[in-house]
Amino acid sequence: MVYPQKARQLNIQGKVYVRFIIEKDGYVSNVEVARSADPELDAEAARVIRMLPRMEPAKVNGKPVRITYTIPINFRLK
């Protein structure tokens, strides 16, 4: 993850909640910002989620299923 330069210059920090689906085939789809902190931070958080590698999908009764996740991504300057 790369802290956005504009956000760094303006000392912008915050927590972005990103919602996405892991499909039956293990790929990420439908990435969206569920709760915004700042447009620059939002864009970087969504970019990072879109770059996730293929994963093991969730299973119900041994069969792959789609599952929705919402995760927080913290941006803090030190």
What are these language model-derived features?
Residues 7-39, 45-52:
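Short tight loops/turns at secondary-structure junctions
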